[in-house]
Swiss-Prot record:
This is Germination protease. Homotetramer. Coiled coil: none annotated. The lineage of its organism: Bacteria, Bacillati, Bacillota, Clostridia, Eubacteriales. Autoproteolytically processed. The inactive tetrameric zymogen termed p46 autoprocesses to a smaller form termed p41, which is active only during spore germination. It catalyses: Endopeptidase action with P4 Glu or Asp, P1 preferably Glu > Asp, P1' hydrophobic and P2' Ala. Gene3D superfamilies: HybD-like. It comes from Clostridium perfringens (strain 13 / Type A).
Length: 325
């Protein structure tokens, strides 16, 4: 069977529904619009049956779809940050004096994969200040620390091992991970933010299966945030072929032999054929938008502000920005 690469729970549900023409038992789906043009979708996987069908762990997956023009409008960026913060706050059940560790996953030398390290560079980190300047830093300010541990190819160390060692040493009460994701739809690239309470498997979307970073491996809650920055080239080619076929079917005379041939094409076999044709020439090619540098800069700011607001509930965004500047 032709498997589409995606890290997004909302897309896994769409693929299942399209393939079997029914909803998934053990999965609850809820969709709402919270701000103008900002849509929030909750996908709750309730049991093992739902987890098996979705190929994802049991838990909540929040998907925030943002307008296309977000990256060029500072006001919309702040609105999205507040929506991200609100979604995070629903998943974070942590007293304000408890410590949070934020981990920016990814390779800072590869732009589509640099979103995690970029977010870390924009965070309000306070753990050291609480120790160095206890008289100046208010008790209502949460101790937050952050790290961008790089990737296995740079450090020679599994990212999960680095984080596990840090957790054992500094003993945070919560880990928040940020990583780049893969999508099956080009229109979702850089326009979707996924938040989950199930942890993360770094690099899974592009076929690199590393040590999982979750509550089971670390012993504390793990919240994962991600933004799709790449799409599998075979998926783009397959979608383009679908558009061509649909248009040819619309133009053909219903009931005629050519119409029946087009209508009976097995889309699963077509997907496998396209992948097998592309593999010798491009391998596992992933595609990203040409404006990815600007996109990563704006999305990292949105996510960083969302995390800052969620982890510092006693501060408003204006005060956080003053602190950072």
């Amino acid at each position: 069977m032709y498997n589409v690469r995606t890290d997004l729970a909302v897309e896994s549900r769409e693929i299942y529904k399209h393939r079997y023409n029914r909803e998934i038992d053990g999965v609850v789906f809820e969709e709402k619009t919270v701000e103008e043009d900002i849509k929030v979708t909750n996908v709750d996987i309730l049991n093992e049956e739902g987890a098996k069908a979705m190929e994802k762990p049991i838990g909540r997956y929040v998907t925030i779809d943002i307008p296309e023009y977000t990256h060029y409008d500072g006001g919309i960026m702040d609105e999205v940050s507040h929506v991200v913060a609100a979604s995070l706050e629903e998943l974070i059940n942590l007293p304000e004096e408890r410590t949070a560790l934020v981990v920016g996953l990814g390779n800072w030398n590869v732009t589509p994969d640099a979103i995690g390290p970029k977010v870390v560079g924009k965070l309000m980190v306070t753990r050291h200040l609480k120790k160095v300047m206890p008289d100046i830093i208010d008790d209502s300010v949460r101790p937050v620390c952050a790290i961008a541990p790089g990737v296995l190819g740079i450090t020679g160390i599994e990212t999960g091992e680095i984080i596990k060692s840090l957790v054992e040493k500094i003993k945070p009460d919560l880990v928040v991970c940020i990583d780049a994701l893969a999508s099956r739809k080009l229109e979702r690239v850089a326009r979707t933010i996924q938040i989950s309470n199930t942890g993360i498997s770094p690099g899974a979307g592009v076929g690199n299966h590393r040590m999982q970073i979750n509550e089971e491996s670390l012993g504390i809650p793990v919240i994962a945030l991600g933004v799709p920055t790449v799409v599998d080239a075979a998926t783009i080619a397959n979608d383009a072929m679908d558009l061509v076929l649909d248009e040819m079917i619309n133009q053909a005379d219903a009931g005629k032999e050519f119409y029946n041939i087009l209508n009976n094409i097995d889309k699963n076999e077509k997907g496998m054929m396209i992948k097998s044709l592309l593999d010798p020439y491009v391998g596992d090619l992933m595609v990203t938008p040409k404006e990815i540098d600007d996109i990563i800069e704006s999305v990292s700011k949105i996510i960083a502000n969302g995390i800052n607001i969620a982890l510092q509930p006693n501060m408003v965004l204006e005060d956080i920005n003053k602190f950072l500047n």
